[in-house]
UniProtKB/Swiss-Prot annotation:
It comes from Mycosarcoma maydis (Corn smut fungus). Keywords: Cytoplasm, mRNA processing, mRNA splicing, Nucleus, Spliceosome. Its main location: cytoplasm. InterPro entries: Helix_hairpin_bin_sf, Isy1, Isy1_sf. This is Pre-mRNA-splicing factor ISY1. The lineage of its organism: Eukaryota, Fungi, Dikarya, Basidiomycota, Ustilaginomycotina. Involved in pre-mRNA splicing.
Amino acid sequence: MARNQEKAQSMLYRFREAQATSLGVSTKPARRPRLASSVSSLKECERWRSDVIREISRKVSKIQDFGLNDYEVRDLNDEINKLLREKGHWENQIVALGGANYKRGVPSMLGDDKGVVGRGGYKYFGRAKDLPGVKELFTSQKADEAGRSEERYERFRNLPPSYYGDEDEDDGLLLEQERSAEEVEWNERFWNVVQGLKHDLQSRDDHDNMHLTDAEDDEHGGIQVPKIPRPSPRPLKQSVQAVQASLSAAYNQRFMEHAATPAESTSKRAPQDELQTPAKRHKNEQGHPIPPTHHADAEPSRTTLEPPSVADYSIFSPEDLQPPPIPDRAAIEKLILQAKKKQLRQEYIGA
């Protein structure tokens, strides 16, 4: 070893080394830079990243050796974590220089290491997982996670309706604000429809030079804005109670109607001939079947307990479900005629 060091210090050896370096064929191994940000060559960054990966693989294989004591295992595990951080620095520098992003869409070179990550992202490999205190650390972490999940579940288990906003409408202020906003938007949309129809009629009219001022549009030709086809707003609690009451009343009514019908015959099912083909037993002298007739003294019709219809579930009346009235052609023509009369009165009479 001493002889090799002496050779390296000789004048001829240093001359050959300088000559090889100038030609770009130096055989002396270069040391890896301490800072990845100091390298500005993408090719060099790729090279040093590969070098770090090879070193990580070598140390991960070495940490599996059962001949190592606990101190050596801890030192190797620390070195592996340092190399992993250094690999991340080189990957960030590669991305900064416009290279590939190795952190995205690339599987881990160490496999799935879930459950072996300590605090601060510190990882344990090989025999380091069996070190004293490491198993207890992972067991306590799992217990803490289970405890936090249970605590979160119990915290949100018995929340009052006010937490979800179900009691915001009880004071009536929110319903009043919503009703006012609905009326304003309803009026705006209605008059937009009216103005659109008026412009369509004016485009087909010969008098294209008629222009109405803002003051003339106030009357709107006697057209009134219809009310919103909906019942008066009520709090959510009252609406739910009304629906429950309507369902209960409909069910009781159906049940009473079913109980009031006469009792049917004791047989579970009437004969097929009596139910479907009564004309087979009634024939005239020529042998032709007599058409069935409805007798007043016939047995009462059978009624079954049918489920309530969809209308029984609704809290709206039939009038509430009617579409709002929309001005037709006659109403629009009346509006235009009144506006034209008003314009002529102001032009010739001044009133």
